[in-house]
Curated annotation (Swiss-Prot):
Pathway(s) per entry: Cell wall biogenesis; peptidoglycan recycling
Active-site residues annotated for this sequence: H181 (proton donor/acceptor), D252 (nucleophile)
HAMAP family in alphabetical order: NagZ
Species of provenance: Nitrosospira multiformis (strain ATCC 25196 / NCIMB 11849 / C 71)
NCBIfam families assigned: PRK05337.1
Protein name: Beta-hexosaminidase
GO biological process terms on file: carbohydrate metabolic process; cell division; cell wall organization; peptidoglycan biosynthetic process; peptidoglycan turnover; regulation of cell shape
E.C. code: 3.2.1.52
UniProt keyword terms in alphabetical order: Cell cycle, Cell division, Cell shape, Cell wall biogenesis/degradation, Cytoplasm, Glycosidase, Hydrolase, Peptidoglycan synthesis
Residues annotated as binding substrate: D64, R72, R138, K168, H169
Any one of the GO CC terms: cytoplasm
Family designation: Belongs to the glycosyl hydrolase 3 family. NagZ subfamily.
Amino acid sequence: MSLGPVILDIEGTQLTANDKKKLRHPLVGGVILFTRNYSSLAQLMHLTAEIHALRTPPLLVAVDHEGGRVQRFREDFTRLPPMRELGRIWDEHPAQARHLAHEAGYVLAAELRAAGVDFSFTPVLDMDYGQSSVIRDRAFHRDPQAIAELAHSLMSGLKSAGMAAVGKHFPGHGYIEADSHFEMPVDERTYAQIEMDDLIPFRKMIGFGLTGMMPAHVIYPKVDALPAGFSEVWLKKVLRGELGFEGCIFSDDLNMAGAAFAGNPVERAQKALHAGCDMVLLCNNPEAAEMLLAELHWDLPALGVIRLARMRGRPNPDSLVKLHENPNFVSAVEKIAGIGVRSGELPLV
């Protein structure tokens, strides 16, 4: 049974009978994990192994693990800095910032791969305009060139540990204050204005070989009346056509307020898939997930299957024991441990 176009979450730290039933559904292609799904490294490794054993080919296991305030697993994992801290280093020492971004990506991916996670939804390619309530220090910088350089370095670090990268939130979520988790953000700029700044990191990262992309639940009314994640203009004309992106497009969570306009969960998924998404995420709403699996009719095309396969983590990652004996890994952890730590604080390694 090939992978389906839906990514779901699960209830807790181990699979329930209901989880297993849902994850075996042919529409499902992956699982996204949250903090509630983690209690220890041993538990996480058992959980990811159990998820992978459910299906052939194995389901994809994903997580939001960017660094800073968006790091789902903390205990026994290296503390990863907010990406804005790398941007601050860039202002004084660009070469050092690029190196540290690579090391952060390597540590992030090496630890997750050792625990059985296939990929993280990172890096954030949004610009740090200083006004978005949801992006803030998750962004690298205000300068799109700096974002592209640092994101490229982080992606190379991910790749060195066997992990693909997912850029977000196309075509840019940093300009508006509203948080699409709770309301529908509207960005009134023209396409020319967005292209001049916000699109630059996305365009450059596509050129660098970015494997995955997540569009924003944001409306850009001077371009299209629909949010980017539901817009054929943004996904097919701009992202696929003008920018030449050939990787996997993941919707943002369809349970967010920014997706509510599209109707019930099935209608939201249908509209996102028709617009050009390869996979849709539905999180933190078990009843909606049941409805989606019961009523959605969608066959993932062959090209979509290929795109999903590219998201799978490289086989046979280093074990945690082997990682901690690896001088390159130990050195990388030491280098990033103090990033963003203020006077009087202790680094959490």
